């Protein structure tokens, strides 16, 4: 009760008494009313976040974490016998993460046998997102006062990317909150020196443990603690020298205890408390799975993005008011020089991870969600910058004018929320123009929130027709796990099916839900997307982030099935019918073109089939100018038509559009071989090897080329093994490289009798 009374006195009684006495300032010159304003703002942010998140969909990665949570729980249930949660694979790096929030909520879900469990996951995410807002605000208050705390709270709530991910991203948002919580307690712990408050030490320990129990990158908080403690000790060495060893022991104890706590929630770490944690830390930014995404109007691989990808995305998607405040904080560093240590802490924690990701060329995707943990620090700096400007202005009316300018800059994200809820995170600022201006240039709903609204529309509006092949309406979707969840209570009427956008004509479905994410930007930019059989669109700022398609014909699927049955004539007939309905039908156009190109290998049919293939491909490419398979097939046509230069040019275009497209390199090498350019063919195949697309066909072709170049068997193998040795060294596979080093020595020994 005493604590509650002190709280009420500090935040309400004292400010309101001061207002009544017309004395609204503390001895530091801050208006006391900022205290109750902060309480109102922080409470509003919690309930506002929970209210807005009710309409959120399932995030793109959510089910992977659901499945891993079950593996983690099984690991503990079986006493470690079930090691699925502790065994990383090439396609599953989740054992590198502890993901404690996921595990915690699924323990509750299992305990109460909750069927509709996604809202509970999202509620936990909301609360943890709000925790980040709270601790960022408290950090700002510690440095700049309660007005800075209010600014931080408001700016984080009005940050569309942060708020939108707080709806359902139970990995990046809890990690961001745990990190800012750790930073806050690091500052508080150091501030308290030479005294050591046990409550602060305990909270710092729990914060670091919490961060590391979500993602191994939480160990960065240990490094932060050590770095900032050393700097603070040097700064305050006269005061702190007598308590150096005491402080050192406490600091080590905090870090060791945090490490032990996080290990208990992390199966992979339990299997190897030192080696596995080190392995996870060194591999956390080296995702083995690269994905393609739209950036700067091109489809690009996530492991080959420009160095400025993350910084640019941050600049494009952060509200101008935050960027302005951040800039002001740098401008006013001299003015705030007495607080240099605190500014250094916040600035370093905001910028260092971004710089490291750029330097390390990390494999990142999905905008900058992997860097969300830096954002609370950025916003704290922004709030301090805005606060400093107001502190410097002495004229009351000038303060009002600046405050009004701040409010006007907040209108843009607020209006975005109103127009585009629940897709708050699909946001681009005025540097880009608007979300509409970014359409076709950058990914929109990359976390697939819009699937929920699309599924709801299908459930309410879908009807059987003459094309329906069974008792149920088949709903196709690339993201099958969320689709299954959305339709789990309607299985009497609906059946879900997995279908990729590029293969939508290859299977049976009646309706398809398609997220615009992953659609080739050339198709978007030339206006052929959405296709004409679109019956519903989910839009953000007037552009579709997801669509619902209704099947108009199934000739393409039937033709595809005929080809699988090797009934070429029937396939040709069915593909032609599909094209009569939809001239740019992907399955039909490319399927029929492939048939014609195959038939053109027969001399008697070449003159008839090649022009037909070219016409089909030209029509399709006009609608889909950067379609890799279509352009690759057109390059085949050119090579068959003895237009080698055009074939090579088109192969280069395909490689530019997708540097991992194996067929383009192989076809270009074939073209070079046909012209007798052995070195040119070798160059294409070496480039292919360096993309990581190693195959038996590539190795055999290289060996053949080396022999054509005049090398005997032994030297051809030595040259091949040397290439493979260099490749494996380049990607860090020292063991594989050593095997080829040994193979070279064996060949040389056999050839020349070397000992």
Which residues does each PLM region occupy?
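C-terminal luminal/periplasmic domains and tails of membrane-associated envelope-modifying transferases
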Residues: 3, 435-755
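Membrane-interface helix-loop-helix junctions at transmembrane boundaries of multi-pass membrane enzymes
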Residues: 27-32, 193, 236-252, 328-348, ...
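Transmembrane-helix signature of polytopic, membrane-embedded enzymes
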Residues: 38-40, 136-158, 177, 195-199, ...
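Signature aromatic-anchored transmembrane alpha helix within multi-pass, membrane-resident enzymes
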Residues: 39-43, 223-230, 251-256, 334, ...
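Transmembrane-helix motifs of polytopic, lipid-linked glycan transferases
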Residues: 123-143, 181, 185
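Hydrophobic, aromatic-rich transmembrane alpha-helices
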Residues: 136, 312-340, 388, 497-499
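Membrane-interface transmembrane helices that cradle and orient dolichyl/undecaprenyl
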Residues: 182-200
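Membrane-lumen/periplasm interface segments of specific transmembrane helices
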Residues: 252-286, 408-424, 684
